[in-house]
Each structure stands twice: as structure tokens, then as C-alpha cells.
């Protein structure tokens, strides 16, 4: 290492030959070092997206191959499932926690942790259940439908492994009532699994008894809420329960129950075969894995696609959908996670990453990863008003803030479409949304409030101009 005397001599020599003063030299040295740091940091930046075919979990997403048992086995489903079960419940839970998988139904709760909440002891008097939420009713969302339609055995095998890990005796797949074809495919796949001994009295030859049932819903969006779904299975009105007690303690028929999403369970077999570390290698920390994104709206090729978590929104749209109709500069806004999350304007969409944490930082959410793209031809006020109408219609009416407040949201946004409102009603609209948010038994109130909040946050000038134009037209009208 160069000693202090030599370092001083080197500095003096350099300044004498370059004509730099000591102060100028230090500034140059710092600037050079900073540039090198930036270049090194840029080299170390991990880019996300571009999932390779060998890493795709859903290999029949588009129904190009046989959806039933023979085709599923050829694609790797049910491969050494008995060996996975033989490794034990604790091993399965450990791998699921190591994978970093977060719930794919919208909330994003760590799945392995959720599965571990189930009691470790069982009794004949209080059996334990796994309930699959296949009541996919969120506007813009169509990922679970594709799984049930084209890859049903991934879901059934996932039910078996998840059920075993949480000591469940049966799984109830609660499917949306409108999904007639998907229910038929699923029931046929379940029959195949029973006949092959993959589920039933001696599932996969392990001695573990596990049954799978399909329960058809009746078209109510509110039944997508886990406790309302449980009420519906029990034959009651689909209205959310007060919590606690939580389903893990008192769920279906008063017994310990875990309610989880179709995609969450369907990816479990592949994770357990390839290892939690493999799944965790995709996406940013705490946003691990691959994800199904369903992209609709003003894109050239709407589609559902499996991609790596944390892929930039712009890359997702350009690569898989052929871009925005009219080009990226024609983009007005995107709802990134289904109708219940706030819309984002173009300037945020330019760089935002499609994962839980980055979207939360931008005051939106990943939700169900249903990407609704809107170009500049969109009347953003009318679009959000239409969502408010949906939530008004789907409210179960149990909570006053939701029953009354969501109706008020729609009444005001509907008038804002034409501009027939007072300027101070914009603030009133936001205040109503705040009074609904967080004041209801379930999250439907939040789901109704957030789109309105996003509209006001990012498109308030458009609302104000609409009101001004209405007032101007009113003054000019002879009537």
C-alpha cells in the first residue's frame, strides 16, 4: 500500500503537470469516483421480466394441449407427488415459506405463513378444511378461469398438497356460477383423479384420505370475500362475517379452515418439485415468483400471460400485448390490479414495476394483476363512474358506510360524467370515500373507494374542466 508521503508526492506531481489546484483536483477525483460507482451500480442492477419457457409453471395456459389427466401427466403434473407427501407436512410448509409466495388473490399475504396457522392437532368432531376461492368476479380479472379451463390438474394436485400440509380432510372449490364450462372441465378432471387413485381414500398411495368437491356460486361478487364464501357454502346468504374468529379457528361449519386463491394453490406442486429457492429467485425481494397477468383494454393483443414478478409495466404491455393502441404516448392511464385498485397516469406507468411493493409506493396495488389499459380516447370519469355503479350493485348492504356511501359515490361520479356538479363536490366525493374506507366488515368498501380516490388524485383537472364546460354550456343555452 502507498504510504502517506508517496501519496502527497503523487498529488503534487499530478497537479503540477495538469495545472489543477488542490481543490480542483479533489473535485475531479470525487467526480471520477462517483461516476465509477454509478457505472458499477448500473452493472449490478437486476432487470426483471423475460421469463423463459423452461421456468413457466402454467404450460397449457392457452389450451393448446390435452387438458385432462393424460396430457397433464405428460406435462409433469402428478410427478412423484407421493414422494412430496412422504417428506412430511413440516417440509412442505418450510419450502412454501422459503419460496416467498404471496397470495395471488389480491391481499398478498405470505402463503406458507397462512397455511401454518391451521391447528396442528385434529379430531373427528372438528375436521379441517381447505376452501379454494374460484369466485373470480373482479372486473378485468380472468386468470383463474384459464387455470380451471386449461390446467385443472395443477389445481387439484395443489389442493392435495396444500390440504395435506394443513391437515385438511377435504377441499371445497367454490367456483363462480357463471363459469359453466370451467366447472364441467374441473368436475371431469376430479373424476379422473379419483379413478386414478390420486385423491380419495388412499391419495397417491400414501394412506391419506382427501376429497375434493366443486361448489357452484350464484353470481354474487361479495362471495369472493372469504367469510361470505364460507357462508354461501353453508347455504346461507353470502354476507361477510365479523372477525375474529378467523377462518383458521372457526371457518366452514365452525371448523378450522383456510381459504386461498386458485393460482396460489396451483403453483404449489411446481414449487415443491423445483424448490422454494428456485421460485424465490424470480422477482424482487418480498415480491417473489412468477405471476399470471391478464391485460385488457386499449392494447393491440389482449392476453393472459405468465411473467416474472417485478416486470416493468411498459415492458409487460409492449412485449406481450403488442403495445398500446396508438402507441405508448397515446396512453392515458392504467388500472394495474383489477377494478378495486387506484388508476395510475402515464407518467407513473412509464417506470412502475408490477409487484406488490412498487405499486403500493405509487399508491395503487397489484391486486389480482388484472391490467386494464386506457388510452387517450378514454373518458376516465365515465370509466370510474362505471366501476362505482358495479360496486353499488354488488354491495351486500350489511354495513351502513358501504350500503349508503357507495351509492353516494356513484350518484356523484355519474353526474361528473356530464359535469353536472358543483366544484366543491369533488372534495365531498373524496371525503365520502375516506369515510367508507376502513369502516366496513369486509374490503368491498375499500374496493369501491380506491378507484374514486385515484381518479381525484391524478385526474382532478379533467373533472374541474368538465364542470366548467357544463356551466359554460348552461349559460350559453337559450333554455
From Swiss-Prot:
NADH binds at residues 103-112. Keywords: 4Fe-4S, Electron transport, Flavoprotein, FMN, Iron, Iron-sulfur, Membrane, Metal-binding, Mitochondrion, Mitochondrion inner membrane, NAD, Oxidoreductase, Respiratory chain, Transit peptide, Translocase, Transport, Ubiquinone. One of its GO terms (molecular function) is FMN binding. GO terms for cellular component: mitochondrial inner membrane; mitochondrial membrane; mitochondrion; respiratory chain complex I. [4Fe-4S] cluster binds at residues 396, 399, 402, 442. It catalyses: a ubiquinone + NADH + 5 H(+)(in) = a ubiquinol + NAD(+) + 4 H(+)(out). It is found in: Mitochondrion inner membrane. Its EC number is 7.1.1.2. PROSITE patterns: COMPLEX1_51K_1, COMPLEX1_51K_2. FMN binds at residues 216-264. One of its GO terms (biological process) is mitochondrial electron transport, NADH to ubiquinone. It comes from the Eukaryota. It is a peripheral membrane protein. Binds 1 FMN. Binds 1 [4Fe-4S] cluster. It is an enzyme of class 7 (translocase). The keyword Iron applies. SMART domains: NADH_4Fe-4S. Its cofactor is FMN; [4Fe-4S] cluster. Belongs to the complex I 51 kDa subunit family. Complex I is composed of about 45 different subunits. This is a component of the flavoprotein-sulfur (FP) fragment of the enzyme. Core subunit of the mitochondrial membrane respiratory chain NADH dehydrogenase (Complex I) that is believed to belong to the minimal assembly required for catalysis. Complex I functions in the transfer of electrons from NADH to the respiratory chain. The immediate electron acceptor for the enzyme is believed to be ubiquinone. This is NADH dehydrogenase [ubiquinone] flavoprotein 1, mitochondrial. It comes from Dictyostelium discoideum (Social amoeba).
Amino acid at each position: 500500500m502507498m504510504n502517506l508521503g508517496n501519496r502527497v508526492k503523487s498529488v503534487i506531481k499530478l497537479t503540477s503537470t495538469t495545472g489543477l489546484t488542490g481543490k480542483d483536483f479533489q473535485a475531479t477525483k470525487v467526480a471520477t469516483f462517483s461516476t465509477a460507482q454509478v457505472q458499477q451500480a448500473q452493472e449490478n442492477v437486476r432487470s426483471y421480466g423475460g421469463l423463459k419457457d423452461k421456468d413457466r409453471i402454467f404450460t397449457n395456459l392457452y389450451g393448446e394441449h390435452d387438458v385432462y389427466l393424460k396430457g397433464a401427466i405428460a406435462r409433469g403434473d402428478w410427478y412423484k407427488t407421493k414422494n412430496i407427501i412422504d417428506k412430511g407436512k413440516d417440509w412442505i410448509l418450510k419450502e412454501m415459506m422459503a419460496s416467498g409466495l404471496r397470495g395471488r388473490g389480491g391481499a398478498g399475504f405470505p402463503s406458507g405463513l397462512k397455511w401454518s396457522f391451521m391447528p396442528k392437532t385434529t379430531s373427528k368432531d372438528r375436521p379441517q378444511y381447505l376452501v379454494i376461492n374460484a369466485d373470480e368476479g373482479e372486473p378485468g380479472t380472468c386468470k383463474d378461469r384459464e387455470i380451471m379451463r386449461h390446467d385443472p390438474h395443477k389445481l387439484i394436485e395443489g389442493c392435495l398438497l396444500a390440504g395435506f400440509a394443513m391437515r385438511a380432510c377435504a377441499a371445497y372449490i367454490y367456483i363462480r356460477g357463471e363459469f359453466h364450462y370451467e366447472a364441467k372441465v374441473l368436475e371431469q378432471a376430479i373424476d379422473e383423479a379419483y379413478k386414478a387413485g390420486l385423491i380419495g381414500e388412499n391419495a397417491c398411495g400414501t394412506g391419506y384420505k382427501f376429497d375434493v368437491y366443486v361448489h357452484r356460486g350464484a353470481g354474487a361478487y361479495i362471495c369472493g370475500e372469504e367469510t361470505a364464501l364460507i357462508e354461501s357454502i353453508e347455504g346461507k346468504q353470502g354476507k361477510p362475517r365479523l372477525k375474529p374468529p378467523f377462518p383458521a379457528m372457526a371457518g366452514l361449519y365452525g371448523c378450522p379452515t383456510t381459504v386461498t386463491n386458485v393460482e396460489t394453490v396451483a403453483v404449489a406442486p411446481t414449487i415443491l418439485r423445483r424448490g422454494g429457492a428456485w421460485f424465490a429467485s424470480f422477482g424482487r425481494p418480498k415480491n417473489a415468483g412468477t405471476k399470471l397477468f391478464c391485460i385488457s383494454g386499449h392494447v393491440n393483443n389482449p392476453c393472459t400471460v405468465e411473467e416474472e414478478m417485478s416486470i416493468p409495466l411498459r415492458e409487460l404491455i409492449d412485449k406481450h400485448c403488442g403495445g398500446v393502441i396508438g402507441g405508448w404516448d397515446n396512453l392515458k392511464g392504467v388500472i394495474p390490479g383489477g377494478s378495486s385498485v387506484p388508476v395510475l397516469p402515464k407518467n407513473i406507468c412509464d417506470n412502475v414495476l408490477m409487484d406488490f411493493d412498487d405499486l403500493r409506493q405509487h399508491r395503487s396495488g397489484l391486486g389480482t394483476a388484472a391490467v386494464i389499459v386506457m388510452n387517450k380516447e378514454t373518458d376516465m370519469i365515465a370509466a370510474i363512474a362505471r366501476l362505482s355503479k358495479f360496486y353499488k350493485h354488488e354491495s351486500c348492504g350489511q354495513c351502513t358506510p358501504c350500503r349508503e356511501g357507495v351509492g353516494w359515490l356513484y350518484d356523484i361520479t355519474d353526474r361528473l360524467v356530464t359535469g353536472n356538479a358543483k366544484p366543491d363536490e369533488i372534495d365531498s366525493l373524496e371525503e365520502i370515500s375516506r369515510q367508507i374506507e376502513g369502516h366496513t366488515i369486509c374490503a368491498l368498501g375499500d374496493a369501491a373507494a380506491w378507484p374514486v380516490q385515484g381518479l381525484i388524485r391524478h385526474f382532478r383537472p379533467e373533472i374541474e374542466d368538465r364542470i366548467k364546460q357544463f356551466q359554460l354550456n348552461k349559460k350559453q343555452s337559450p333554455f
